Structures are given as C-alpha cells and as structure tokens.
Amino acid sequence: MVVDFWTWEQTFQELIQEAKPRATWTLKLDGNLQLDCLAQGWKQYQQRAFGWFRCSSCQRSWASAQVQILCHTYWEHWTSQGQVRMRLFGQRCQKCSWSQYEMPEFSSDSTMRILSNLVQHILKKYYGNGTRKSPEMPVILEVSLEGSHDTANCEACTLGICGQGLKSCMTKPSKSLLPHLKTGNSSPGIGAVYLANQAKNQSAEAKEAKGSGYEKLGPSRDPDPLNICVFILLLVFIVVKCFTSE
C-alpha cells in the first residue's frame, strides 16, 4: 500500500493556512529519520495512529492501532518558513517468512487526525503566544482488534521507537491522580494515600532502628545477678583474709 502523499500535503497546507495564513510550511516524507537524531534547531514530534497494511507477497491485510509516525520540524523565524520531515514506520506479515516491511495506508479520518495533531504541535512549539491550544486527538479504532501488538514484526519496535516496545521507559503516573493532589478533593487520591503511608512506614522504621540501637549501645539499667554474687564473694574473701591474718 502506498500513501497518497500529495493529498496529505494539500490537507496539511489547508490546516496551516487556516491557523497561520502568512506562514509557509512544507511537508516531505523522509525514510531516514532517526529518533533523537536532530540537526541544530530542529524539534521532534511522535504520534501513533490507526492504519492498514497489505502483504506484497500473500496479499494478506491487517489493521493496527500502533502505527508509529515520527516528525522533525524546523521553523525560520525571520522568513516565517517552516519544514516538516515525516517518517511512517511499517510492519511485516506474520504469515510470510522473510517478508518485507509494508508501508501503512490510512483512512481519510485517520489522515485528518494525524495532520491535525501535527499542526497543533507546530502551533504550540512555534506560535505559542496567543494561540488557542487544543488537546491531541486520540486514536480511534476503526475495527475491533484481537491480541496484543506484534512487536516482533513492527519496524518501530525493532528500532526502539514504538511505545509498545518500550513500556518500561514510557510508563508515567496516571493523570487521574493529579486532580486529587492539586484541587484538594475531600477523598484523597491513591497517590496521596501512598505518599502518606510511605512516610508513616519510614517514620516507624526510623523509630524502631533508633530504639534497637539504644538497647544495644546504651548501658543496662537492671543490675546483673552474676556481678552481685561476685562482689559478695569478694567481700567475704577479704573479711576472712583479715581475720586469718590477725
């Protein structure tokens, strides 16, 4: 499948001109883009989308909600001209051995979502002052999907770019906890309860350690019976010795 990139460019230009009529931006595909490898002055933007693939060998088709899209953006302030380099990451067929990475194809709705999110990123990064900020449009499943993401046949996963392939690095605290911590909700959030319990446990452990250290290092308050017996025997021995010498 081949992306109709001419249509993408036209849609991108319409969205940019609607927001910034005097700005000039170009959008180009670049299959050599690498994550975190940017020239000076460039910025990076990554998103995922719902797309379709077709195997060029067996003609099998499949859908994925983990199609990764990497963009590098640059804007020249004095000329008000900007550039976008975009890379679409492919997937391989599960059924064919030695299959190649196939490029994704997107529905018109998914295409609009991808480009709208890209334009919002540009407006936020380069035209932040006085620009109405909109949240990123989420991925919408066009069909029901079964099973987990096929990381073994995902090009982005093999390159360490796909979020599904880097769960340990991408994990963040749930946003649902933030309102409880910021607004002072009457019922404490999970994060607040966790922090309170953690502080309480640390305080208890400190007290226990301090108490145990005092018992080991400090002097004993109770007299030792053995020492008393030795003292009495020594006293008796001295008295007997005195009488014997007389």
Curated annotation (Swiss-Prot):
Tell me where on the tree of life, at the top rank, the source sits.
Eukaryota
Q: Does the keyword Zinc apply?
A: yes
Alphabetical GO biological process terms? defense response to virus; detection of chemical stimulus involved in sensory perception of bitter taste; protein insertion into membrane; protein targeting to membrane
Main localization, broad class: membrane
Tell me where it resides.
Membrane; Cytoplasm
Alphabetically list the UniProt keywords. Answer: Cytoplasm, Membrane, Metal-binding, Transmembrane, Transmembrane helix, Zinc, Zinc-finger
Q: Which residues lie on this side of the membrane: Cytoplasmic?
A: 1-224
Family matches, as Pfam families: Zn_ribbon_3CxxC
- Tell me which residue ranges form 3CxxC-type zinc fingers: 48-159
Question: Which conditions up-regulate this protein?
Answer: By interferons. Upon influenza virus infection.
Alphabetical list of PANTHER family matching this protein: RECEPTOR TRANSPORTING PROTEIN, RECEPTOR-TRANSPORTING PROTEIN 4
Assembly with partners or alone: Interacts with TASR16. Interacts with OPRD1 and OPRM1; the interaction promotes cell surface localization of the OPDR1-OPRM1 heterodimer.
Indicate the family of this protein.
Answer: Belongs to the TMEM7 family.
What function is annotated for this protein?
Chaperone protein that facilitates the trafficking and functional cell surface expression of some G-protein coupled receptors (GPCRs). Promotes functional expression of the bitter taste receptor TAS2R16. Also promotes functional expression of the opioid receptor heterodimer OPRD1-OPRM1. In addition, acts as a potent IFN-inducible suppressor of pathogens including lyssavirus rabies, influenza A or yellow fever virus. Mechanistically, associates with the viral replicase, binds viral RNA, and thereby suppresses viral genome amplification that replicates at the endoplasmic reticulum.
User: What is the protein's given name?
Assistant: Receptor-transporting protein 4
Lineage of origin: Eukaryota, Metazoa, Chordata, Craniata, Vertebrata
